[in-house]
A protein has these predicted regions:
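Cytosolic regulatory modules rich in charged/polar residues
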Residues: 3-161
Length: 161
């Protein structure tokens, strides 16, 4: 149900941005079973916005908002709950492209999948804010003519680059 694993991905990739603390359930559960499993779990993430329904191969098939689960009757099947379009992020996708996907589709969170399409993590809008901050900082440095040089570089080192 809950997955934790240590992953190493390139610095500018979605894999580096993602959290490996997420909630995934099977579509054959009902709302009551899902809520009961949350209550007894010692492994539940502190914050989460969506529950991912996965097939037997751990491939995401739907995302259901936590608010949708809370508003539904206990006997309603998870697969019958309304879910939004599932936008999946590849673990090796560049973080700037991930930020673009969040902006384009107005995402709160998105599942991250490996090269086999299996769910391995989640990226939230909070993570993307950091990407935008970093990109804005880079843009400001470029506008100021600083480029990739370290601020601690001497004037001679900077001008020779």
């Amino acid at each position: 149900m809950y997955k934790r694993q240590s992953l190493n991905y390139p610095e500018d990739s979605a894999g580096r941005l993602m959290s490996v603390d997420f909630v995934s359930l099977t579509p054959n559960m009902n709302v009551g079973e899902a809520i009961d499993s949350f209550r007894i779990s010692d492994d539940l993430p502190i914050e989460f916005y969506e529950i991912y329904l996965v097939n037997d191969s751990s491939k995401p098939i739907a995302a259901i908002s936590l608010s949708n689960i809370i508003r539904s009757s206990r006997d309603k099947s998870l697969k019958d709950l309304e879910s939004h379009e599932l936008i999946m992020i590849s673990a090796d996708m560049d973080r700037e492209l991930v930020a673009y996907q969040f902006e384009r589709f107005d995402l709160v969170s998105a599942p991250v999948v490996d090269d086999k399409g299996s769910l391995i993590g989640v990226i939230t809008a909070d993570d993307i804010v950091e990407v935008f901050k970093d990109e804005a900082g880079e843009d400001i440095k470029l506008l100021g003519g600083v480029g990739d040089e370290d601020i601690t570089d001497s004037v001679i080192e900077t001008s020779s680059n």
